[in-house]
């Protein structure tokens, strides 16, 4: 029951977070800091008028920003498949791009429970 409530809550949060975010062609996520504690990062990715896809990434204590970015890229590729182009850039940065002809999309941080980790989103 607890997992069901958490899933419903995250879905509601993601729809609110996505609604407040602009849609763009490309997004850049910049990770800063290290994982002072274990936790998780949940991102919501949604195309125009599409339901958000949630990607939850478990993060182990002690990982640096480059290792965290790698884990996020792996989870995004797993969850999104070939819907978007996902690349790790400069170690700690992640680019998510739409494919030619596909609609613009939004990205939002739904949850970050990792102490010491900052996540900034930039539209491009």
Regions found by a protein language model. Give the residues of each.
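N-terminal signal peptide c-region/cleavage motif recognized by signal peptidases
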Residues: 14-17
């Amino acid at each position: 029951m607890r997992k069901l409530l958490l899933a419903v809550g995250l879905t509601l949060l993601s729809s609110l977070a996505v609604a407040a975010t602009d849609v763009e062609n490309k997004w850049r996520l910049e990770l800063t800091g290290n994982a002072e504690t274990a936790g998780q990062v949940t991102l919501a990715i949604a195309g125009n008028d599409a339901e958000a896809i949630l990607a939850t990434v478990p993060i182990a204590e002690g990982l640096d920003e480059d290792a965290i970015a790698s884990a996020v890229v792996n989870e995004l590729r797993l969850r999104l498949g070939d819907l978007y182009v996902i690349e790790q850039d400069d170690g700690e940065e992640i680019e998510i791009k739409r494919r030619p002809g596909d609609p613009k999309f939004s990205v939002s941080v739904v949850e970050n429970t990792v102490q010491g980790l900052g996540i900034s989103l930039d539209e491009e």
